[in-house]
Amino acid sequence: MQVNSILERFLIKGAGKHLYRFSNADNKTWLMPTHNMQVAMNLYQPSGRNGKIMKALFPWLHHLLIIRKIIHAESVYCDITDELKRLFCQLFHETEIEFSIFCGTPCIHQKITMQISKGKHILGYCKVTDNKEIALLFRNEANILKELGRKGLKEVPICMFCGEMTDG
């Protein structure tokens, strides 16, 4: 899977929201908005000491150039496509949403995960792929979650949409 080619299908570059793109030593990449970054950083789950320090401090210090240089954060502007924005707004009953992106663990089953939020509240998550095998895994996961919910298990995530987008 080419993560950049998938991102190009649902991100509009050069316009929209101000985000920072950064990667860790394992070549995992994130796109985090400058607005409500503390909420967005919930998508960033570091295990190492340096990553945990960055998660705690970057939302407060991202405006300092020296900090961005230390972590090799690139300033980018982008927004999601209108089709995807409409879908999220409809699913979450909101007129505006915010997003952050994890580009996945580099592996054969790499997928993109988006965190959808509004203000200080996380609304949900979205997984994205262009790989048919991974899409089948998504469908199986959605079916399992639905079955667990039917069996009465509490706190089971609800899959609100599992399908293809026409924009790619």
What are these regions (language model features)?
Residues L19, G51-M54, C107, I122, ...:
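Polar low-complexity intrinsically disordered regions enriched in Ser/Thr and small residues
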